[in-house]
């Protein structure tokens, strides 16, 4: 295999692509360096066809290697284990733009592995992974129909920045990843700080121009390969059976069943109608069992295709959807707050047949989520988890940990709400939102945004305003384009685009798009985003009517957190030798304490207001400067011939000389014992900080 290398300057960084040096036994492999970030993409396909599946068996793995960032994995085991959430999200980011480009009938296992070998902190390896994946698949024998690329885009000081640095992203109002072909944008994922619809469209156009530049480089590379692609045999339905099917199917009957409003009833009636036709078709047909199974499967696909075409035709020609709505109409919405008596905040958001129960839990600063990835190190104080149990769609499946889809949906909703969450200075709590999807017929991630926003206000979290989300769809047929508002599952499955927009009344906070067709241009995006904005405003009105602003007080079951500031020089005194002082406070007052030794900020967390207040007063007492004239009720720790030593507070001991003990000066050794308490006054503090005490009444 010949070693080849290509280099191009792109967006202030050098991109180097190598082939034929490493992973030469893979069907396709490329080594891509962009800046100082390096990824290796390998693509392979199984020789065996998988029977009984009706989807492309593609697996995309994204491997984060800690050595890439010069780090050793944290924890007891110093080896990379199962993929982190960030790795799963990166795998999804690579998967989404490439999956639609595989042939529909590919039934061989395909595995794409993107391994991160080096990161520079400023060049995102996940986006580089999209470019590497496109190249690896195109130079392999794996059937793959297209060239894709991705970019990350920021918006700093009113200017769009392609592949922004970490420093620029901190100031940016926008952080989106956009992927696409030379002709169209096919995938968008990101968050924003209330950008307008116009700004978002402009961002997508800038991103697409950048994508075209990268694809030109990919085309230059791929022009030097003459690849023989593996042939996929497309199964052909029996023409005689298709003829019988056409004779038996009635468009009027199909329409009646398609336009049933309830999802489960519609699905059941369509299935019943399909099975009746299939049963009649195969009554007098003699064929091998394997062939019969195949033909049944193909006829089921044919039925689905007929139903899909009819759904799209009705939408285009009549402007009516399967559940009877107009194209720009949202489903009926109900909102409730305070539905769970003992949680810190809760809300039930129902939109048509999609329902999310949002729950908020408040925690202490020490309960922050630790983040340790190759790109990021620190903590998170706002967390959102999304759960999609099988009963939400009437299915039976084993309950295991969250899947990739759940992690992805939760991440999108978290990004949508993050824009309105108060700073730590305003609200010192760690905030966890959980969305339990109780039923689903599309757009459950956007229902999560709505239930989460309502639950945050119910919990008394001082969010600036409500955030709502809506999923939009698109039907393109014979040159006609119809944008659908608040799509349900059927429209998501059979439509041409699914894009989710979340935001406030002021602008967009999160955006996700997956497009199945080419040619979604600027004007169509503008129209779709404007329609989404109108829907969002209607949803926000309903949410504000339910709860207008955050509750003024927290739940009585929420923990109390009080933050005070002490002199950073006094932190050592508060902790004490070996943590003795702080441990005694925690035990005595049943509280948790976190200390920022740089700023001197002390957070006291507990469930009993009285004990929290007592702990605060005690901390203030032991960390304040002792001055002449201060009076203390101290404990005697030592008795010497010349006087007694009194502990005024932990670590602070003064001497009451016998001459300062008044009437007890002669018999103090008989009168006092170690452990007795005595009221004393500070009479002097010498230049060495030694405290001199006198007895006071």
From Swiss-Prot:
Coarse class of the protein's main subcellular location: cytoplasm
Limits of the KH domain: 559-619
UniProt cross-references to SMART domains, sorted A to Z: KH, S1
GO cellular component, one term: cytosol
Cofactor: Mg(2+)
A Gene Ontology molecular function term of the record: 3'-5'-RNA exonuclease activity
Top enzyme category: transferase
E.C. number(s) listed in UniProt: 2.7.7.8
Record keywords: Cytoplasm, Magnesium, Metal-binding, Nucleotidyltransferase, RNA-binding, Transferase
Stated role: Involved in mRNA degradation. Catalyzes the phosphorolysis of single-stranded polyribonucleotides processively in the 3'- to 5'-direction.
Name of the protein in question: Polyribonucleotide nucleotidyltransferase
Classification of source organism: Bacteria, Thermotogati, Thermotogota, Thermotogae, Thermotogales
């Amino acid at each position: 295999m010949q070693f080849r290398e290509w280099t191009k300057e792109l967006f202030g960084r050098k991109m180097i692509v190598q082939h034929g040096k490493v992973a030469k036994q893979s069907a396709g492999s490329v080594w891509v360096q962009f800046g100082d970030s390096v990824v290796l993409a390998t693509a392979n396909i199984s020789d065996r066809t998988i029977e009984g599946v009706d989807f492309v068996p593609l697996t995309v793995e994204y491997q984060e290697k800690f050595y890439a960032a010069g780090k050793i994995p944290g924890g007891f085991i110093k080896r990379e284990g199962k993929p982190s959430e960030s790795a799963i999200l990166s795998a999804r980011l690579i998967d989404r733009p490439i999956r639609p480009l595989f042939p529909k009938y590919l039934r061989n296992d395909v595995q794409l592995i993107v391994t991160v070998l080096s990161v520079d902190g400023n060049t995102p390896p996940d986006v580089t992974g999209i470019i590497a994946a496109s190249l690896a698949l195109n130079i392999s024998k794996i059937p793959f129909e297209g060239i894709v690329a991705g970019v990350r885009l920021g918006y700093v000081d009113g200017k769009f920045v392609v592949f922004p640095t970490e420093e620029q992203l901190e100031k940016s109002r926008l952080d989106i990843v956009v992927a696409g072909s030379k002709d169209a944008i096919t995938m968008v994922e990101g968050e924003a700080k209330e950008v307008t619809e116009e700004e978002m469209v402009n961002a997508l156009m800038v991103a697409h121009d950048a994508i075209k530049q990268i694809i030109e480089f990919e085309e230059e590379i791929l022009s030097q390969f003459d690849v023989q692609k593996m042939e996929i045999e497309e199964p052909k339905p029996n023409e005689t059976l298709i003829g019988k099917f056409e004779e038996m199917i009635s468009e009027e009957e199909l329409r009646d069943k398609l336009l049933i409003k309830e999802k489960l009833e519609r699905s059941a009636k369509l299935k019943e109608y399909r099975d009746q036709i299939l049963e009649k078709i195969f009554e007098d047909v003699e064929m091998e069992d394997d062939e019969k199974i195949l033909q049944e499967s193909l006829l089921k696909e044919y039925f689905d295709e007929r139903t899909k075409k009819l759904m799209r035709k009705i939408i285009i020609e009549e402007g009516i959807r399967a559940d009877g709505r107009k194209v720009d109409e949202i489903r009926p919405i109900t909102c409730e707050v305070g539905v769970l008596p003992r949680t810190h905040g809760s809300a039930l958001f129902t939109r048509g047949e999609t329902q999310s129960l949002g729950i908020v839990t408040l925690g202490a600063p020490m309960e922050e989520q630790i983040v340790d990835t190759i790109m990021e190190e620190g903590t998170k104080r706002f967390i959102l988890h999304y759960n999609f149990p099988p009963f939400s769609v009437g299915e039976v499946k084993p309950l295991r940990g969250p899947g990739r889809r759940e992690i992805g949906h939760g991440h999108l909703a978290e990004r949508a709400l993050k824009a309105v969450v108060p700073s730590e200075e305003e609200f010192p709590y760690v905030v966890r939102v959980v969305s339990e999807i109780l039923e689903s017929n599309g757009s459950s991630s956007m229902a999560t945004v709505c239930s989460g926003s309502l639950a945050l206000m119910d919990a008394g979290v001082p969010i600036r305003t409500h955030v709502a989300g809506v999923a939009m769809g698109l039907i393109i047929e014979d040159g006609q384009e119809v944008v659908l508002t608040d799509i349900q599952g059927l429209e998501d499955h059979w439509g041409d685009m699914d894009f989710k927009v979340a935001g406030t009344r002021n602008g967009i906070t999160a955006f996700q798009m997956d497009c199945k067709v080419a040619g979604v241009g600027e004007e169509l995006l503008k129209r779709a985003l404007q329609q989404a904005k109108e829907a969002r405003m209607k949803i926000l009105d309903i949410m504000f009517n339910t709860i207008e602003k955050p509750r003024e007080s927290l739940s009585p079951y929420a923990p109390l957190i009080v933050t005070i500031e002490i002199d950073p020089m006094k932190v050592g005194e508060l902790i004490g030798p070996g943590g003795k002082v702080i441990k005694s406070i925690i035990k005595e007052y049943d509280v948790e304490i976190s200390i920022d030794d740089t700023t001197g900020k002390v957070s006291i967390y507990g469930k009993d207001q009285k004990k929290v207040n007592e702990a605060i007063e005690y901390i203030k007492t032991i960390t304040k400067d002792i001055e002449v004239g201060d009076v203390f009720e101290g404990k005697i720790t030592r008795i010497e011939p010349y006087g007694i030593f009194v502990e005024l507070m932990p670590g602070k001991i003064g001497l009451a000389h016998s001459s300062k003990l008044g009437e007890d000066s002669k018999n103090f050794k008989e009168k006092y014992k170690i452990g007795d308490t005595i009221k004393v006054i500070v009479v002097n503090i010498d230049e060495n900080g030694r405290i001199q005490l006198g007895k006071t009444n």
